[in-house]
């Protein structure tokens, strides 16, 4: 897939050089004027534009209708939404407005209307809406703990839906302090301090002051900790070390070596080292692999903690992203260093099952297995397993598929060109209103709206239909949609 994108991208300068100059400004177009009215929050002008374009039967009237209603969604009532859905059933704007309305209903805590609307949400790709939906399922007596944790841990920014879900389940006893501390660590790792502060505050509102201090100055916070050894204190100390590591991983490593590596329980000390290693890897520091190995040594009990009874929990609380950076740090070690493949193996094996199935980690795990296999007959089983893993991804038309093919001694060949599109196949996307609207929006300079309309229209298309849609975009010189749509095919691959 990367090879196909590269070929298309290399062709772009040649084609773009021959393209016509950009069209004149479309600022006088009524749809563009309506979009400008939305930007200015000019409700009267937007309402007038909506009425005029609806009366004319303009092909983009539905977008102006959407802008007008979404601009006053806070005061809208269900009958208005129902009428909109009836006018534009099956279109992108219908589902887009339903998405917006579900968010509004969640903020209103109108769970009856939310529960009625949610099953009709076709895209179902909004994480906050998913959190609201899980909350309604919890209210109905369903066990949503696992799904709620997954949604909460995956949120990028604090939003009402996922924070409400977390706080509700925490108050109900369905989430525990360990869950909240894990969210605090994940948020700190992702540099989302507000989310980390919220999670710590769930455990105890009094933690808010400590979180503010450690976020502002982790060095000073740790210096003031003295003999605080409660479990909550130790969690806060770990967060401070993570914050410190993000600024200066070597300094944080020094703090762990000097005292904190012994003062914290094994699991927390190991996690601190793991985050020091990730931050060092992000900065491409040569000692990153050493820090990662130190994390595993502590996790395995290689260092005696201050609390002899403490031991690592069964589940490793490190993210897939952190483990991926451990692999990258390992691969920067010299090929002759045996710890290179040991660290890579350990990190990949600790990833989630879904992450381990990614071609990159299948490839590097196989390479590690080959490198660590015993010589002679004792290593035959390991080498056979590595070869089978490489064969499993060698058929993929991707970067790591190519590397696997070469590792197996083969040569990468381009896939056979698909049969030419028939006249009927080429005509089909031209008759699709969604594609027509998308191209018109892009031509007007409303690219964001056009791309969303285009992608929605691609839903459910087969391989040949995708090729035809890609061809239409190429002919119209909408190059990002040309490449993106072509890249969606799995079997019908056109490299021309």
What role is predicted for each listed range?
Residues 5-13:
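Bacterial N-terminal signal peptides
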Residues 17-496:
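Cell-wall glycan-active module
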């Amino acid at each position: 897939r990367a090879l196909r994108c590269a070929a298309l991208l290399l062709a772009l300068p040649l084609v773009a050089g021959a393209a016509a100059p950009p069209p004149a400004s479309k600022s006088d177009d009524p749809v563009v004027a309506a979009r400008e009215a939305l930007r200015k929050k000019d409700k009267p002008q937007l309402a007038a534009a909506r009425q005029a374009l609806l009366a004319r039967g303009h092909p983009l009237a539905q977008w102006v209708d959407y802008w007008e209603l979404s601009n006053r969604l806070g005061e809208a009532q269900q009958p208005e939404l129902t009428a909109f859905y009836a006018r534009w059933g099956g279109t992108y704007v219908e589902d887009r407005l339903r998405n917006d309305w579900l968010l509004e209903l969640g903020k209103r805590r109108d769970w009856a209307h939310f529960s009625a609307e949610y099953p009709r949400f076709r895209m179902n790709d909004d994480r906050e809406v998913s959190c609201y939906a899980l909350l309604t399922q919890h209210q109905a007596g369903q066990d949503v703990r696992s799904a709620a944790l997954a949604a909460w841990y995956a949120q990028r920014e604090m939003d009402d839906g996922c924070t409400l879900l977390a706080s509700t389940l925490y108050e109900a006893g369905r989430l525990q302090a360990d869950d909240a501390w894990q969210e605090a660590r994940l948020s700190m790792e992702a540099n989302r301090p507000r989310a980390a502060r919220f999670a710590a505050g769930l455990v105890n509102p009094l933690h808010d002051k400590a979180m503010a201090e450690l976020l502002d100055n982790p060095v000073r916070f740790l210096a003031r900790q003295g003999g605080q050894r409660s479990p909550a204190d130790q969690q806060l100390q770990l967060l401070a070390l993570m914050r410190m590591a993000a600024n200066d991983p070597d300094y944080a490593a020094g703090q762990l070596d000097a005292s904190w590596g012994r003062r914290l329980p094994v699991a927390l000390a190991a996690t601190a080292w793991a985050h020091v290693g990730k931050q060092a890897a992000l900065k491409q520091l040569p000692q990153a692999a050493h820090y990662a190995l130190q994390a595993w040594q502590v996790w395995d009990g290689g260092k005696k903690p201050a609390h002899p009874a403490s031991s690592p929990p069964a589940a490793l609380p490190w993210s897939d992203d952190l483990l991926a950076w451990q692999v990258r740090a390992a691969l920067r070690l010299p090929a002759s260093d045996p710890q290179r493949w040991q660290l890579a193996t350990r990190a990949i094996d600790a990833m989630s099952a879904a992450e381990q199935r990614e071609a990159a980690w299948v490839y590097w795990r196989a390479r590690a297995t080959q490198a660590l296999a015993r010589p002679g007959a004792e290593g035959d089983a390991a080498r056979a397993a590595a070869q089978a893993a490489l064969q499993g991804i060698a058929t993929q038309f991707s970067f790591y598929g190519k590397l696997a093919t070469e590792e197996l001694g083969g040569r990468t060949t381009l896939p056979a060109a698909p049969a030419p599109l028939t006249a009927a196949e080429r005509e089909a996307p031209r008759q699709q209103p969604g594609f027509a609207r998308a191209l018109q929006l892009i031509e007007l300079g409303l690219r964001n709206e056009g791309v969303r309309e285009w992608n929605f229209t691609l839903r459910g298309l087969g391989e040949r239909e995708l090729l035809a849609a890609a061809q239409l975009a190429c002919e119209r010189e909408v190059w990002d949609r040309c490449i993106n749509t072509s890249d969606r095919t799995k079997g019908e691959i056109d490299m021309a």
